[in-house]
């Protein structure tokens, strides 16, 4: 087959694999990510005249070398490369299950090459963790009450980008001072405490939110300018923009230069560090972060909400003192 025919064959294989992955009830975001990765791999394999069915332990090293640099000429991070091969593993499992290949060589390959590759390629650069004063300056410098509330909620809860965007108005209780986060594969703890300061910013936003188009019909807590649920890239742009205004985000930095990038995940580091330095117990911190229990005994020793709220409020600092 020529290159075009190989590409067409690879893309058909991808579509069949995606149908199978959907049947496994994978998360929608996982399905989208797998689809993007596999279509990219389909093109790369087409360029080197290989179908997915041709892949074995002898030619996977060549594929690894081919994917290290993206279309923009940037060298991919070890995490990104591992992500590509994780997607490829899902497709190869499908081909093995349907007897289109004799065996799936990806697990053996990843153990031999990607573990050491990740260790060698790690940048060793810690993600940026702002000071209290820097977080305050970002919030103060944000131009809209919506964006100020976003920064405040991220800082006070440590929610991830996706988790914050999934929040609905009904998930916020300003009386009990808590937020109910949606259950995800990465989050166990659902009921999260917030302090008076975060409550004030949310109250201001909920008042201002009424003026947004579609506010009555859309249940999402944070809306975009069209009145729909805030998107991933829009949220990232807000955080990047406001961090950049305070000199905390370099838009020209490489994605691996974590110390020069101000992203939603920065707040997760800030919250964890702040609570720990203020004496909050590790178990409460794990609960707020949504981490799994530390031991099997933790499943029987129930962590009471009153304990979570008390320790959290004692450890969480006031960022913007009232005049």
Where do the model's predicted regions map?
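C-terminal catalytic core of Y-nucleophile DNA break-rejoin enzymes
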Residues: 184-204, 217-241, 263
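C-terminal secondary-structure termini that scaffold catalytic or DNA-interacting sites
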Residues: 1-4, 314-323
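C-terminal catalytic core of tyrosine-transesterase DNA break-rejoin enzymes
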Residues: 152, 156, 265-292
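Short, polar N-cap/turn motifs at the start of nucleic acid-interacting alpha helices
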Residues: 172-174, 260, 280-301, 323
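Basic, Lys/Arg- and aromatic-enriched nucleic-acid-binding interface segment
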Residues: 130-161, 268
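Flexible interdomain linker/hinge and immediately adjacent N-terminus
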Residues: 97-137, 182-185, 225-228
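N-terminal core-binding DNA-recognition domain of tyrosine recombinases/integrases
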Residues: 15-29, 35-120
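Catalytic-site neighborhood detector that most strongly recognizes the C-terminal catalytic loop/helix
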Residues: 183, 289-315
């Amino acid at each position: 087959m020529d290159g075009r025919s190989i590409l067409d064959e690879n893309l058909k294989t991808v579509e069949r694999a995606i149908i199978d992955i959907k049947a496994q009830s994978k998360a929608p975001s996982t399905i989208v990510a797998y689809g993007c990765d596999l279509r990219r791999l389909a093109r790369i394999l087409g360029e080197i005249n290989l179908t997915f069915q041709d892949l074995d332990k002898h030619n996977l090293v060549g594929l690894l070398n081919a994917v290290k640099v993206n279309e923009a000429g940037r060298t991919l991070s070890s995490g990104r490369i591992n992500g590509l091969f994780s997607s490829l593993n899902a497709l190869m499992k499908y081909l093995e299950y349907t007897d289109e290949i004799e065996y799936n060589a990806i697990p053996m390959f990843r153990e031999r090459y990607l573990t050491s590759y990740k260790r060698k390629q790690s940048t060793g650069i810690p993600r940026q963790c702002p000071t209290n004063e820097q977080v305050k300056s970002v919030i103060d410098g944000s131009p809209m009450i919506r964006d100020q509330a976003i920064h405040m909620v991220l800082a006070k809860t440590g929610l991830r980008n996706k988790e914050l965007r999934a929040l609905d108005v009904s998930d916020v209780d300003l009386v009990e001072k808590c937020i109910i986060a949606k259950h995800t594969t990465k989050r166990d703890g659902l009921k999260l405490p917030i302090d008076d300061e975060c409550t004030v910013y949310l109250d201001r936003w909920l008042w201002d939110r009424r003026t947004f188009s579609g506010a009555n019909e859309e249940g999402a807590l944070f809306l975009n300018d069209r009145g729909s649920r805030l998107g991933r890239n829009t949220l990232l742009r807000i955080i990047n923009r406001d961090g950049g205004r305070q000199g905390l985000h370099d838009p020209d930095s490489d994605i691996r230069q974590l110390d020069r990038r101000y992203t939603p995940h920065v707040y997760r580091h800030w919250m964890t560090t702040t609570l720990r330095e203020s004496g909050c117990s590790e178990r409460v911190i794990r609960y707020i972060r949504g981490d799994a229990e530390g031991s099997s005994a933790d499943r029987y020793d129930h962590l009471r909400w009153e304990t979570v709220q008390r320790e959290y409020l004692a450890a969480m600092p006031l960022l913007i003192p009232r005049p």
